[in-house]
A protein has these predicted regions:
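Hydrophobic cores of alpha-helical transmembrane segments in multi-pass integral membrane proteins
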Residues: 2-109, 126-180, 189-248
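Surface-exposed beta-loop interaction hotspot
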Residues: 117-127
């Protein structure tokens, strides 16, 4: 358990260093600090799979911890291959914030129930954080575009990919819910929150075809989406902090 704590703290330290280098316009230092943090964070994620005494994917793909890993992967990719590398690096700020939240979150895993021991649950827990990470980063780059009064990193592509991943998570989640509870949809907060997120971004994909929707309006809508996702997910995260856990 101590090893996990040291690893995630080290990753957060590297991300904090990357923020410093980015502010100081030391882009090379920022990039390598992000890469170092990502490597350490990957080790943290891998070790979580063994917290219960035997390997379980649920320890790896818990959203609070897996989503920053996905975000780190995307930021590294964009910082290396995007046309706007300097703008892409600014996303280390939300990466640092989400990793810091994970560092202070209970590190143990919630004991997996029988209805979670299915490939459909794994597919859901993998694709949903990918969707959330794309939504957050797309919102960040949209907000950056508003501040700089020009389109920065391609926030639209991130939101499209986020919608694809999130839609897959809803389908796999529905299959998992049917196998585990006998219904593809449960009348609970978790499912309604997912419905809100899906409808919000489904609307985003269509408003760009409406007359009168300027680029600024689209950016504002895209940036606001990150707030919608946060409001719909952090309630569940805070609630689950009180759940009994294995390993701390």
């Amino acid at each position: 358990m101590k090893e996990l704590v040291y690893l995630i703290y080290a990753a957060v330290f590297f991300y904090a260093a990357a923020v410093f280098f980015m502010i100081m316009k030391k882009n090379r230092g920022a990039y390598f600090s992000i890469a170092a943090g990502f490597i350490v964070y990957s080790a943290f994620i891998a070790l979580r799979g063994w917290l219960s005494g035997f390997f379980t994917t649920y320890g790896i793909f818990e959203g609070v911890f897996f989503m920053p890993w996905v975000m780190g992967f995307i930021v590294i990719f964009l910082s290396a291959y995007s046309k706007d590398k300097e703008d892409a690096l600014t996303a280390v700020i939300p990466l640092f914030c989400f990793s810091l939240f994970a560092a202070f979150y209970p590190k143990g895993i919630i004991p997996p129930t029988p209805n979670k021991l299915t490939i459909w649950a794994d597919l859901f827990f993998i694709t949903e954080p990918f969707g959330h990470a794309c939504f957050y980063l797309g919102g960040w780059y949209a907000a950056l575009s508003i501040v700089k009064k020009r389109k920065t990193a391609d926030y639209h592509s991130l939101l499209v990919w986020g919608f694809v991943f999130f839609s897959i998570s809803q389908v796999t989640g529905a299959v998992w819910a049917f196998l585990g509870w006998g219904s593809p949809f449960r009348w609970g907060a978790r499912h309604f929150q997912s419905a809100v997120i899906w409808c919000y971004y489904a609307a985003y994909l269509h408003i760009r075809f409406l007359k009168g929707w300027t680029d600024l309006r689209k950016m504002l809508y895209a940036a606001s989406g990150a707030v919608v996702v946060a409001l719909c997910t952090f309630g569940s995260h805070l609630k689950e902090m009180g759940f009994p856990r294995i390993g701390g």
